[in-house]
Amino acid sequence: MATTMTKWTLKGKGYEFCNCNPGCTCNFSGFPSSSDGSCKAFVGVAIKEGKCGDVDLSGITCAGVFDWPKAIHEGGGKVVFIVPEKIRDDQLDALAKIFTGQLKGLPWEILGTTYVVAGLVKADMKVTDAGMESSLKVPGVVNAVGETFKNPVTGEPHQAAIALNDGFIWKRGECGVGSFKVDAADLHLSYKNTNWILYDFDWSN
């Protein structure tokens, strides 16, 4: 008899910072626009509604620190996950299975094949949810700050967004300029004035 796979669903808001130029060419050509062709990213995941089997994941804010030497689909990456300090064991187990693609479902059944888990940090993350001026901070671990594009002539806010009808991570992303510094386990990243995208996600298997 075939084993029934545990059903899961996550809905919420994503905060994506990476070392590509603003807009991130990976969304179009599949390859980074970073100076060395690598993909380094910090992605915050604020789960508003979430469930994996009987495990409630609603209200959890977590993150991944990603380090791929080339384009994501070329693999060879590493990730360190950041989870709340007091996360329950059953919640951590559920998220680990989701984010490593063990339970299938996009985007993680694809992303999970491109990296190995290099560490886990248990620390509470402070999210200042202010649209394109949002920030995410864990003292001594991560500081990520987003900014709205500015019109080069007037200096006024310049709103920009990307629509991906077939996007498997997000369908619509609000774009801006971000800076992020991360020291998590063995991953150390620091970038200024690079890509930052804010989006809503609805993932499931």
Question: Where are the predicted features?
Answer:
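Intrinsically disordered, low-complexity boundary segments flanking structured domains
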Residues: 2-4, 29-32, 66-70, 122-123
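Extended, charged low-complexity segments
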Residues: 152-205
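N-terminal ordered "arm"
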Residues: 3-50
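Low-complexity, flexible helical/coil segments
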Residues: 53-59, 81, 115-121, 170-177
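A general structural signal for short secondary-structure boundary/capping elements
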Residues: 62-68, 128-131, 184
